[in-house]
Amino acid sequence: MNASGTFFFVVGPSGAGKDALMDGARAALDDNYVFARRVITRPEGAVGEAHEAVSEAEFARRQRSGEFLVTWDAHDLRYGLPCSLMSELERGRHVVANGSRAVIAELAQRLPRFVVVLVTAPQDVLARRIAARGRESGEQIARRVARTGAALPPEVRCLTVLNDSTLEVGRARFVEALRHGTRVASDGAPASRTNLMAKLRGEPLDQAAYVAVLQDAMAGRYTEAELTEFLVAATRSLDDQEVVALARARTVFTPRIKWDEPIVVDKHSIGGVPGSRITLIVVPIVAAYGLAMPKTSSRAITSAAGTADAMETVARVDLAHDDVRRCVAQARACIAWNGRLNHSVVDDVMNAITRPLRLDSRRWAVASILSKKYTAGATHVIVDLPYGPQTKLATRADAEALGAMFEHVGKGLGLHVRALVTDGSRPIGRGIGPALEVRDVRQVLANDPCAPADLREKALRFAGEIIAFDARVGSPAEGLRIATALLSEGKAKAAFDRIAATQGARPEPVAPGAHTCVVSATMQGRVAAIDGLRISGVARAAGAPRELGAGVDLLCTIGAKVESGQPLYRIHAGSDAALAAAAALARAGGECSEAVRIDPD
């Protein structure tokens, strides 16, 4: 059988949106692409894809007669792809079929031009989509999105499509993947293979070599096994100048945004500290001063809140490029979700490998982060590097070394980068979860005496450093003085309100969840530590960040004396069921039960 078309086998986790992307591709592609109609032992007209419904007996008969190319079982149903699809391949048409990872190896052995299309999305996006169906509880959803699919056979070609933005963006990425995939089997050995092999031997690559490897990787010309070897080698031998070369290579794939501004500011934090929502304070202070700060941020993946989740409690964050320009023109800044703005095809391919393997890819990440700041049009970048026992950087020395790397690579890209090492050993602020963190932010902006002092102090430090990027200011100390005045005089609050209004403010901010319970001390003593990972675990069990009002409100501070029975923190949730799940995790001896450690006096 001489099949000349390409067989695309689409897989991905629940909530990834495979069916929606395939529907869009069906309308966008020409007749040279055939979309398989699966045979399923499910009634005609049932919820789900259009399919050929058959009885169990009829399915078994067809299987015995050899009428299926492949079959599999899932969710108490039987699925099959008809052998007639081989005729389409022989005519040179490309087949697109939605299927199961379990049969990938079998199909790869039978089909000469076989490409897996892996549709994926961050866990928080998957969870929101599954929750919107209304068929599963929060706990069931959490378990579902935490599952990891079986590893793909190493010899199989795989194209990854990140579907974390709008349906329109997702469909465009999916269609582009299919078009790339038609060339995978016919291109032969990638032209950049000599570069890849050099990296496997530990040799440094220059910018041109990285461009060539990345182009072939994005086109699906390397197997997942080959890319894994490449990334493992890169994490072991990537010297300072090579990180600069990699960062420059990445900028080739995205045109740089042009701003008619002498200074365009951006900020990045490597995260890992619960609370610490300083961006929502820093940006309006900087905007009130007059510098342009088009800030784009991520949603949470494993934490209780991301900057975009927090801002979404007060305003729209899914801005397009024109919206960002309008916000900067009218309000000098924005705080937007980066899903529609800073998408990197390179990251789609590489993150699919580095995240499951938990590779120490910090140097690779520096190149990724700063290349995206460059293409976003930033001229000056400040980086927050918290260190502590539960952050990504264990020691101050680790943070200082990474800070030096950020500044070195930034210089290589023509950026002015300032990296600040900060204490990440404890939560900053009292709220953990989108609405609760924004409550703290609004207290700081309003100069409320109850505002968390640590949140205010850290935000002012970063705002002062950014304002000092303006040569007229002269020093970070003077920048801090200016930032403090802008905050104290209410100008930062006015700037925040203006930014929210320009983005599209909610009529009322999302309030903390109304379903609450308190976790109290079981002994007398002093608060010795607040475990950020465990306290975030309780907040996530309560529904954060999917439920914007869910989270934890800290009622104690490290070093404070507490009595037995004294409240330590309050859990907020959007439902009784979510509250019960979080409370059980906090109290029943689970991993989060010692979120606040008390030592006897």
Curated annotation (Swiss-Prot):
Family: In the N-terminal section; belongs to the ribose 1,5-bisphosphokinase family.
Pfam families for the chain: Glycos_transf_3 (PF00591), PYNP_C (PF07831)
UniProt-recorded name of the protein: Bifunctional ribose 1,5-bisphosphokinase-thymidine phosphorylase
EC code(s) of this entry: 2.7.4.23, 2.4.2.4
Pathway linked to the protein: Metabolic intermediate biosynthesis; 5-phospho-alpha-D-ribose 1-diphosphate biosynthesis; 5-phospho-alpha-D-ribose 1-diphosphate from D-ribose 5-phosphate (route II): step 3/3
Keyword ATP-binding carried by entry: yes
Reaction catalysis annotation: alpha-D-ribose 1,5-bisphosphate + ATP = 5-phospho-alpha-D-ribose 1-diphosphate + ADP; thymidine + phosphate = 2-deoxy-alpha-D-ribose 1-phosphate + thymine
Primary gene name: phnN
Keywords: ATP-binding, Glycosyltransferase, Nucleotide-binding, Transferase
